[in-house]
Amino acid sequence: MNPNPPVFVVDDEEPVRVSLSKLLRAMGYPTQSFASATAFLESEAVSEHGCLLLDLRMPGMSGIDLIEELTRRQLAVPIIVMTGHTDMKSVQRLESFPLVGFLEKPFSVDQLRELLDRWRFGT
């Protein structure tokens, strides 16, 4: 039995999903990845206790749209947002949500580990 709760990777880019999933497993986290926000919402993972590693810009439902939908459904999912395209409008929209943290792509393993530790241990 794995002592770490799962991390759910939601990103429309397959290479990102694959590499993050491998990295997270190497760090001891069970993972499940999703190619879209809609796929995550339609899965059983949405009701599991875990952390969401979420890309902001995706076709269809964006990462911000997913955060808003989870909030509307009153699902308190810990979320680490990642993006390669930071814009002030998105940052301002995100300020109203209790996120674990924000990663700007490309990010380091240490940056990811720091946010996972913050989620797990409150550090």
Which residues does each PLM region occupy?
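Acidic catalytic/metal-coordinating carboxylates
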Residues: 35-36, 62-65
